[in-house]
UniProtKB/Swiss-Prot annotation:
GO cellular component term of the entry, any: extracellular region
Protein name per Swiss-Prot or TrEMBL: Immunoglobulin lambda variable 3-27
SMART domains according to UniProt: IG, IGv
Organism domain of life: Eukaryota
Ig-like domain sequence ranges: 21-113
GO aspect biological process, one term: immune response
Region of interest called Complementarity-determining-3, as start-end residue ranges on this chain: 107-113
InterPro entries: Ig-like_dom (IPR007110), Ig-like_dom_sf (IPR036179), Ig-like_fold (IPR013783), Ig_sub (IPR003599), Ig_V-set (IPR013106), IgV_Light_Chain (IPR050150)
């Protein structure tokens, strides 16, 4: 993907279906470096199950950035945060950096309590 100056595309998967659960995300979110990016994920299962967020850069394995809706694993920068409201979860990247350009996936499954 070509870098456009002052534009930080955060590309995300539109729809993920896992164990008959359908989760929907917008096709893309674009922000300038330093701005706040918010990526939503919605699905009925999210009212009962936690969401996890993964970041994946080209040629690399996915990295867990948020679990249990809002918990951040060790080593993940504080600019990454998660929240939940009803059937929607949100990944927020406050002060997005160029290195945050990636695909972001939300995930929830039957074994995810």
């Amino acid at each position: 993907m070509a870098w456009i100056p002052l534009l930080l595309p955060l590309l995300i998967l539109c729809t993920v279906s896992v164990a008959s659960y359908e989760l929907t995300q917008p096709s893309s979110v674009s922000v300038s470096p330093g701005q706040t990016a918010r990526i939503t994920c919605s699905g009925d299962v999210l009212a009962k199950k936690y969401a996890r967020w993964f970041q994946q850069k080209p040629g690399q394995a996915p990295v867990l950035v948020i679990y249990k809706d809002s918990e951040r694993p060790s080593g993940i920068p504080e600019r990454f945060s998660g929240s939940s409201s009803g059937t929607t979860v949100t990944l927020t990247i406050s002060g997005a950096q160029v290195e945050d350009e990636a695909d972001y996936y939300c995930y929830s499954a039957a074994d995810n309590n």
